[in-house]
């Protein structure tokens, strides 16, 4: 024990001996059970003293136990829910105190500190019946017991306690609590959070209830270590909460890290287009992909039903699954083992007869699918052609507009320079300040719009005529703005408002263009995906054809074998 706890114990047994004895006798005469007595040292200064309260009676204990059990989810640090906060804890404790004090069986009013202390000790001594004790929760923001340094050292010497044990055999005796008499230590106004000292010796000496005998036997060996751990846990309950949160976060972070570790190389579609990917790149990325996503062609029966989908991770380029060489290699390696010896042919005769019918059906289905796919591809090609024509047309229109805009912009620049000069003259003659100078830089910036606009991309968004209309309208609106801006030459105020409108228009155009570019990219990706699907379908078809051819060969060989057998049988029968 630390010096502080010993000081408290010494003060209790020395100076306040009379008080503690009196409290003990009072409690034991009211009921046969001694639990918590808050006794005052006789020599401590009067202003810091708590009033002397009698011990809890058995009825009061029962009331408190039921209340604790009711609110256990909130007040118990071990079993509480995640979402609780310190305010809910505070309110719950206040509610417990109110319910306890308003209960008919209660003889004396108790305050929150006394009830919390009773909760703590009943948990510590394993007397709280509903759950076996664990670290208890004192960290409710309003009532911090830590400000009163409680030394849980027993004020009564150990021999005296053993006498108590002999007197009340079936009753658990709690050591009496001594508030340390130092005025500096026990000062409710000062918020000094001292450590709570616990004496671990008493825990193992409690008489064993027949109910709890097995528990006690198991726990007695651990009791001292537990009590010390609990003392620390009370001091550090807030820290423990923080640590729990951190641990949870750390675990989550680790899990996320593990998840990301699986896919180390992720190809970003924006960075690498399909054309730029070399074979080496593909081989390099192929090794890094998770095993499940690599498409393996297993058995011909499985492939027909199995639908190949593009993997869910969008940022990995789908081409990374299969290289041209690798895919063919797979097909060849799958086909080779099917060139089987005669003995195996004979073993598989019945199976193969069925399989041929299946294979023919599959081949027909595949042929239909292939035809559909080709039709789709043709449609796609036509659509793309149409879109390209639209793009060219729109680009021509836009080039024309840009030329117009540049001419208008040049005119506008001249007009603005004239206007600026006029405004400067106005400023020199009349001393009224105008905002010309602050507005001028934005004016010159705004006139550069038409050159900066990379318009031809915009049409790619929808391969239809209305996009052309949109572009022409935006372009014309820009040019209108420019001319109006030039016309408002007279004073600086109209000039600045026009520039504001112009910069807004410019921004709008920029965003429209960005949107169009993104749509174009989206379409490119979609067509890329379709192309890949088409390639897969074609490859599968090749594979199926090959398998079918081999099967047909097998069956022809079988037919020959059967014919030879028949001939032999006939010879045998004739002979």
Curated annotation (Swiss-Prot):
| Principal location | nucleus
Q: What GO molecular function terms would the record report?
A: sequence-specific DNA binding
Q: Name one GO cellular component term.
A: polytene chromosome interband
Identify the stretch(es) annotated as Disordered.
1-53, 151-174
Quote the biased-composition stretches of kind Polar residues, using this chain's numbering. 31-51
Q: Where in the cell is it found?
A: Nucleus
Q: Does the keyword Metal-binding apply?
A: no
Which Pfam family name is an example for this entry? Myb_DNA-bind_5
Q: Which GO BP terms apply?
A: heterochromatin formation; positive regulation of DNA-templated transcription; positive regulation of gene expression
Keyword Mitochondrion belongs to the record:
no
**InterPro entries (UniProt xref):** Myb_DNA-bind_5 (IPR028002)
Q: Where is this region: Hydrophobic?
A: 2-47
* Gly residues composition bias: residue spans: 1-26
Q: Which residues bind DNA?
A: 48-128
Ranges of biased composition (kind: Low complexity): 151-164
Q: Which keywords fit this entry according to its UniProt record?
A: DNA-binding, Nucleus, Transcription, Transcription regulation
* PANTHER family xrefs: PTHR31535, REGULATORY PROTEIN ZESTE
**Physiological role:** Involved in transvection phenomena (= synapsis-dependent gene expression), where the synaptic pairing of chromosomes carrying genes with which zeste interacts influences the expression of these genes. Zeste binds to DNA and stimulates transcription from a nearby promoter.
Give the record's subunit note: Self-associates forming complexes of several hundred monomers.
Q: Name the chain's protein.
A: Regulatory protein zeste
- Source organism: Drosophila melanogaster
Gene assigned in the entry: z
């Amino acid at each position: 024990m630390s010096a502080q706890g010993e000081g408290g114990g010494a003060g209790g047994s020395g100076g306040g001996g009379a008080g503690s004895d009196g409290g003990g006798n009072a409690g034991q005469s009211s009921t046969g059970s001694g639990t918590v007595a808050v006794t005052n040292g006789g020599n401590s200064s009067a202003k810091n003293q708590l009033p002397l309260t009698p011990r809890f009676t058995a009825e009061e204990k029962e009331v408190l136990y039921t209340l604790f059990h009711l609110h256990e989810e909130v007040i118990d640090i071990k079993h509480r829910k995640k979402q609780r906060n310190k305010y809910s804890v505070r309110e719950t404790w206040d509610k417990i105190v109110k319910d306890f004090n308003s209960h008919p069986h209660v003889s004396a009013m108790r305050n929150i500190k006394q009830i919390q202390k009773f909760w703590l000790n009943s948990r510590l001594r394993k007397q709280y019946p509903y759950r076996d004790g664990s670290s208890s929760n004192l960290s409710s923001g309003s009532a911090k017991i830590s400000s009163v340094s409680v030394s849980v050292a027993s004020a009564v010497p150990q021999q005296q306690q053993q006498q108590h044990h002999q007197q009340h055999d079936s009753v658990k005796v709690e050591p009496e609590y001594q508030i340390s008499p130092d005025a500096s230590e026990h000062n409710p106004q000062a918020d000094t959070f001292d450590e709570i000292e616990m004496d671990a010796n008493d825990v193992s000496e409690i008489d064993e209830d027949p109910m709890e005998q097995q528990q006690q036997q198991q726990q007695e060996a651990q009791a001292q270590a537990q009590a010390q751990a609990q003392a620390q846990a009370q001091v550090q309950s807030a820290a423990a909460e923080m640590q729990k949160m951190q641990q949870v976060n750390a675990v989550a972070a680790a899990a996320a890290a593990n998840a990301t570790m699986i896919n180390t190389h992720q190809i970003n579609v924006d960075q690498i287009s399909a054309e730029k990917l070399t074979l080496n790149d593909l081989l390099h990325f192929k090794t890094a992909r998770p095993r499940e996503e690599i498409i393996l062609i297993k058995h011909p029966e499985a492939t027909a039903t199995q639908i190949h989908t593009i993997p869910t991770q969008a940022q990995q380029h789908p081409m990374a699954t299969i290289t041209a060489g690798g895919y063919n290699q797979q097909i060849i390696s799958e086909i080779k083992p099917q060139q089987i010896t005669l003995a195996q042919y004979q073993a598989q005769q019945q199976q193969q007869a069925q399989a041929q019918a299946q294979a023919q059906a599959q081949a027909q289905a595949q042929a239909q699918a292939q035809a559909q796919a080709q039709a789709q591809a043709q449609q796609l090609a036509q659509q793309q052609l149409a879109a390209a024509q639209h793009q060219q047309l729109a680009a021509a229109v836009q080039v024309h507009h840009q030329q117009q805009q540049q001419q208008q912009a040049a005119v506008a620049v001249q007009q603005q320079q004239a206007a600026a000069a006029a405004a400067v003259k106005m400023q020199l003659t009349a001393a009224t300040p105008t905002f010309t100078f602050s507005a001028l830089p934005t004016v010159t910036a705004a006139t550069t719009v038409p050159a900066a606009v990379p318009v031809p991309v915009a049409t790619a968004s929808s391969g239809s005529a209305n996009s052309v209309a949109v572009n022409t309208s935006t372009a014309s609106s820009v040019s209108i703005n420019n001319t109006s801006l030039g016309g408002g030459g007279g004073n600086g105020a109209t000039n600045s408002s026009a520039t504001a409108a112009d910069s807004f228009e410019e921004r709008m155009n920029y965003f429209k263009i960005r949107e169009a570019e993104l749509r174009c990219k989206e379409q490119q990706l979609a067509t890329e995906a379709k192309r890949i699907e088409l390639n897969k379908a074609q490859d599968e078809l090749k594979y199926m054809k090959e398998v079918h051819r081999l099967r047909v060969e097998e069956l022809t060989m079988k037919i020959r074998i059967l014919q030879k057998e028949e001939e032999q049988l006939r010879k045998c029968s004739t002979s």
